A protein has these predicted regions:
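Extended, folded cores of ATP/NTP-driven motor/assembly subunits in large transport
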Residues: 1-309
């Protein structure tokens, strides 16, 4: 797990400023049905054994987005097939660095054990976007989307939970992995990533979003330095400001010592189902996992929920 964590960090380390990397994991409850292939005797026996059983289907999408190209819209409208030639020089350099960063990231991810990365076709993107908008209900149906305190799409209802501020994180350091407590004690110990309980371990329809925004390493470091100066000059006013000053100062020293790259991040999980009973079970489990891991969370509604969806 540590090695995968290191390779993930290295893969995205050289993305240019203004880049969003969005990892989206979709988990859907489905009934297992064997394919048309015959296979061996054992394969056919396994297929009969699992026929009709419930399982979780997992799809992982990795989105790369570059923001801030001022001349892109005009260039694309005037010539969709040759828009690069009409970009301003500064925007063209940003785009080239962005595409190079994607190639480097994918190359590193491809070398991770048991990992393959495939480009999505136009048809696949269109089908996925349509299915996602309808919360993976009837793909041929056109449904209404209603948003109040929760999300209603056709027969499906959804609830979302977001970790969108550093104050929502647990105090102290966060481990990249924890012990797997889902299995009975044995001679050996198993481990999994911290939030894996909201992945394949969560037996409900759900979507996990992890977004990293590369706002600019030097820009964010300068902001921390300014905040330290502000808190430092006012630290004698009360104990809270003094404590914040000491924590920021300690953080800055760790960043410099480890040469860490600073980014902004966002995490959310959305559970959905056509059954209110199943939705309540999923809701209870998500809250339990977040609370046990000492994460605070925001439950968006109305306008903010619409923006998330």
């Amino acid at each position: 797990i540590d090695e995968r964590d290191r390779m993930y960090r290295e893969a995205f380390r050289h993305m240019p400023d203004g880049t969003y990397v969005h990892k989206q994991d979709v988990f859907l409850k489905k009934d297992y049905h064997r394919g048309k292939g015959t296979g061996s005797f054992l394969d056919r026996a396994d297929a009969r054994h699992f026929e009709g059983r419930l399982y979780i289907d997992h799809t992982c999408i990795l989105h790369f987005v570059l923001a801030g190209l001022k001349s892109l819209e005009k260039a694309y409208v005037s010539s969709p097939l040759a828009y690069k030639e009409h970009l301003h020089r500064e925007d063209y350099k940003k785009l080239e660095a962005f595409l190079e960063g994607i190639d480097n990231a994918v190359s590193i991810l491809q070398n991770m054990r048991g990992t393959s990365v495939l480009p999505m076709s136009h048809e696949w993107i269109s089908a996925f976007t349509h299915a996602y908008s309808g919360l993976f209900g009837d793909t041929d149906a056109v449904v209404d989307i209603h948003i109040d305190g929760s999300l209603h799409v056709g027969k499906n209802h959804a609830r979302c939970y977001a970790v969108c501020d550093e104050t929502f994180l647990p105090e102290g350091s966060i481990e990249s992995y924890v012990r797997d407590e889902s299995l009975p004690p044995a001679a050996s110990q198993l481990y999994h990533p911290l939030m894996e309980q909201l992945g394949m371990y969560l037996p409900y329809n759900h979507i996990v979003n992890q977004v990293i925004y590369f706002e600019g390493n030097e820009k964010l470091r300068s902001r921390i330095a300014r905040n330290i100066d502000i808190y430092g000059s006012n630290s004698s006013m009360n104990k809270t400001i003094e404590r914040e000053f000491k924590e920021l100062d300690k953080l800055q020293k760790e960043i410099i010592e480890d040469n860490q790259m600073l980014v902004r991040s966002f995490f959310s999980v959305c559970v959905f189902d056509g059954s209110d009973t199943e939705l309540e079970k999923a809701d209870k489990r998500v809250r339990e996992v977040l609370n046990l891991n000492r994460f605070k969370y925001y439950i968006p509604g109305y306008e903010n929920l619409a923006k998330m969806h």
